[in-house]
């Protein structure tokens, strides 16, 4: 996040939490993930598109080893109910239902993650990864990305079935 984001984070708790996640994952990268072969050396750590949704902070975290959509409790918000680490949770977003895995992150607390990319070797540059993260976060929060439901099948009553009239309808629709 840039300097302007830091100013906004003073007002927006979701952006502030995104910055905290960035700092925490930078620490992890510098320590536990240093020299781990699944890390893409072209990437750094960034939080993208953090916003408040359903009383939680949601956004995308990009690291040299993953890109995840994450949901975390806001510091001054109402905490979500308990969830055992590794539990699959379904969250309704504007673009549809998304599965998250419940987890814990030191210095943050409960953080639920939906893996988008892991590992992240398909990204040659951090700019490419951030463009993907920005587009993904837009898609998750855009109801227009929902696929339209399939058309209901033509109703066939028993009389039409016995007379064979349903065949003509199927052939006409093809």
From Swiss-Prot:
Family note: Belongs to the HupJ family.
InterPro entries documented for this protein: NiFe-hyd_HybE, NiFe-hyd_HybE_sf
Protein's name according to its UniProt entry: Hydrogenase expression/formation protein HupJ
Gene that this sequence comes from: hupJ
Gene3D superfamilies in UniProt: [NiFe]-hydrogenase assembly chaperone, HybE (3.30.1460.40)
Protein species of origin: Rhizobium leguminosarum bv. viciae
Top-level lineage group: Bacteria
